[in-house]
């Protein structure tokens, strides 16, 4: 048809995945809209809007469940009214961190053309990952008894046992018995705090997978000591940080929220930490280390838009807001080949039954239906 099409997603990780599966360049929505900082207010602003619209015939936005009402508003302002906009996403995943849930509102309004995709290509149809994802989505308990599939449940009697089991899976059992190296395993947890939160799990996983050694330099920042060899994640979009290809073939700028890399070197003389992201590397001044977090374990929220060869999920007592069906469903659907849940079966059952999501009032559904609140 000869149409010019632009692809985008809410996070850098999701945009990268979109590029990989389509073979076409994709960017973050922020980069598409040319985000910048207003020097007078210090607030983020977008160059693209009604007066300076995006130039394309069609726009495809992936992972729409992560897009809040404010970002969608800015996106729509920048797209001329006579163009095509295709929004792709899974409304059963976690809602955005920011205000509203516009993707869900649009679907529930029954005013827009919708195509529901039902065929799964990531796993075989008989995959227990797929079947349990469907079961959880319907509010049915997942099958936790199977021992001959891609989905396993390992019971634990305490938070300490959960953490110890996860460390053993990452450091010994999966690499030895299934040939899955630690760097292809992602530990997910609903919470940041507590014995099975990201802070403690990253601490014990670092101690096991990347212990201190005389040959490894370290740099402390906050409550964590970054060490050469550590797995880390960028936690906010940085459009200005410079990177270079490992083969020296190109240079550029921009490391994005959700990008995962490995600490290659720490220079005390230059006060920098060098992180390798796939085929690129970037230098972080010590003052910039607040943009990085350890990534041996991450929250389920942070995993949205990504997929991993193997996922280990902790399931333990916590806030009903965090232990919800959407959290469990999102975690299960991050796994490509293997999913292991470690914890309490009662917790998994409670998550399956907890379909409550904090109510979000944006008025979008009613506006689309031509009604007033």
Regions found by a protein language model. Name each.
Residues 38-47, 69, 214-216, 322:
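Short gly/ser/thr-rich secondary-structure transition/capping motifs
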Residues 80, 225-228, 256, 303:
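Residue-level recognition of short, solvent-exposed, well-ordered loop/turn junctions
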Residues 138, 246-247, 257-373:
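C-terminal accessory regions
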């Amino acid at each position: 048809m000869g149409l010019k099409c632009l692809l985008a997603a809410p996070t850098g990780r999701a945009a990268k995945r979109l590029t990989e599966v389509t073979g076409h360049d994709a960017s973050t929505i922020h980069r598409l809209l040319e985000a910048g900082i207003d020097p007078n207010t210090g607030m983020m602003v977008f160059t693209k809007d009604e007066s300076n619209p995006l130039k394309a015939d069609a726009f495809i936005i992936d992972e729409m469940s992560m897009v809040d009402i404010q970002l969608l508003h800015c996106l729509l302002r920048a797209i001329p009214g006579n163009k095509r906009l295709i929004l792709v996403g899974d409304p059963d995943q976690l809602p955005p961190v920011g205000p509203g849930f516009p993707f869900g509102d649009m679907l529930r309004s029954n005013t827009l053309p919708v195509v529901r995709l039902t065929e799964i290509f990531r796993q075989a149809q008989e995959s227990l990952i797929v079947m349990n994802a469907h079961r959880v989505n319907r509010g049915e308990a997942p099958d936790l008894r199977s021992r001959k599939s891609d989905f396993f449940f390992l019971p634990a009697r305490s938070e300490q046992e959960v953490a110890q089991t996860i460390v053993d899976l990452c450091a010994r059992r999966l690499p030895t018995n299934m040939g899955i190296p630690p760097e292809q395993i992602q530990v997910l947890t609903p919470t940041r705090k507590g014995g099975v939160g990201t802070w403690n799990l990253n601490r014990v996983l670092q101690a096991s997978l990347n212990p201190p050694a005389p040959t490894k330099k370290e740099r402390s920042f906050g409550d964590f000591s970054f060490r050469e060899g550590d797995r880390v994640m960028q936690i906010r979009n940085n459009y200005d940080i410079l990177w270079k290809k490992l083969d020296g073939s190109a240079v550029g700028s921009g490391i994005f929220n959700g990008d995962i890399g490995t600490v290659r070197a720490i220079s005390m003389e230059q006060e920098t930490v060098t992180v390798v992201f796939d085929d690129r590397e970037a230098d972080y001044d010590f003052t910039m280390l607040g943009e990085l977090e350890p990534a041996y374990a991450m929250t389920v929220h942070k995993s949205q838009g990504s997929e991993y060869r193997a996922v280990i999920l902790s399931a333990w007592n916590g806030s009903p807001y965090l232990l919800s069906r959407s959290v469990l469903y999102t975690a299960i659907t991050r796994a490509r080949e293997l999913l292991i849940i470690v914890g309490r079966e009662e917790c998994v059952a409670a998550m399956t039954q907890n379909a409550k999501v904090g109510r979000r009032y944006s008025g979008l559904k009613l506006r689309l239906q031509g009604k007033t609140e």
